[in-house]
Amino acid sequence: MSATLGFLGLGSMGAGMASRLLETGHDVLVWNRSKDAVAELVAKGAREAATPAEALAAEVSFSMLSNDAAVEAVLTADALAGATGRTHVLMASISPALADRLGPVFTEAGVGYVGAPVLGRPPVAAAGQLNILAAGPAEALAAVEPYLAALGKQTWHLGETPSVANAVKAAVNYNIIHALQAIGESVAMTERLGVDPALFTELLSSTLFGGVVYTGYGKLIAEQNYKPAAFTAELGAKDLGLAAQVAAATGVTPATLPALQHVFEVVLADADLGPDADWSAIAEVSRRNLG
């Protein structure tokens, strides 16, 4: 089924997802603040939308914007005014609180709203192999399901409230952060006993801890290879903050949260690592006794 789709936000993830929609035969209207990213997609067959409103007026539109501030600046009532009867899929990892505030904005504009943050890195997005965490009204989900199937290997249906998808994404990332910290602490201990970090992380990933976090990030930690980042420490700190918001909203007091907040603060302030290091660089706090 071919359709005209809008896509707003062409960072590394958004560009990969928009490319995937093009590859699956769709007409894609793209918008981004940086025109270089737009030009790359146009060269692949996309069409440029002059404004966010033009992209949002497509039959189904998607956004993959960088943070809450960017989402609030782009997905305004004015921009949605011409999208009545359409459906929007918000795929950014935003705060559940913002997702809830946006609900009435979409409703008043007559636009269906699906929250659908994703699990996966840019190459996974480009290959259409994402895990998609989707929540929204049944009618809106049905309208976008074929396109989500093109973008991901599995769509996880999480109910009718879009913000729940964002809360679940924050909870998943909270687990990833714990894994990164656990790898760092255990590598620090075994390395000081003379065990090769590469051997130790291979032991972890090939026995009890298979999966992309231990295999992929374990290798980065073993090699102390944190730049260029696949996902920056600055973004990791943002996602940890989102998890803290979810915990507060649900009345949970996580015992480990203060320690994780501390290691991110140390990495962000470190002259060698800093905010542009990969988020797995939190492993260095234990290895180097930074904190």
Predicted regions located by residue number:
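NAD(P)+-binding Rossmann beta1-loop-alpha1 motif at the extreme N-terminus of oxidoreductases
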Residues: 1-64, 86, 122, 154
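Rossmann-fold NAD(P) dinucleotide-binding segment
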Residues: 52-111
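Hydrophobic residues within alpha-helices
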Residues: 17-18, 37, 102, 147, ...
